[in-house]
């Protein structure tokens, strides 16, 4: 099953946790050796974000995701694991679990060729 890892920055992380975090290169090696890494991207900073909504037929575009965000989506990864527990273990090894947080969600199959 595929899972999305929402990689979230967190302004409240501790310096000790960040210092103890594993290296990202080690995580990529670990995930790739097991065939669990599918793809991922790092997002540009919050000042490049726009929020788009349509309300009552009117387009509303605002700068940034939220005002004074303490947490933000910094990127995402797609992983493939046999169980949710395996996905949690893989996410635990990612340095962003130490420096921010990772939200895991199973990906709903849409029946496309890449599912």
Where do the protein language model's features map onto the residues?
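Conserved, structured core segments of small domains
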Residues: 1-115
């Amino acid at each position: 099953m595929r899972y999305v890892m929402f990689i979230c920055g967190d302004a409240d992380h501790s310096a000790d946790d960040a210092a103890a975090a594993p290296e990202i290169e080690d995580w990529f090696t670990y995930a790739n050796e097991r065939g669990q890494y599918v793809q991922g991207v790092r997002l540009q900073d919050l000042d490049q974000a726009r929020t788009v909504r349509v309300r009552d037929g009117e387009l509303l575009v605002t700068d940034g995701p939220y005002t004074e965000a303490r947490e933000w989506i910094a990127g995402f990864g797609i992983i493939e694991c046999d169980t949710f527990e395996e996905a949690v273990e893989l996410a635990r090894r990612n340095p962003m679990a130490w420096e921010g947080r990772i939200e895991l969600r199973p990906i709903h199959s849409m029946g496309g060729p890449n599912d």
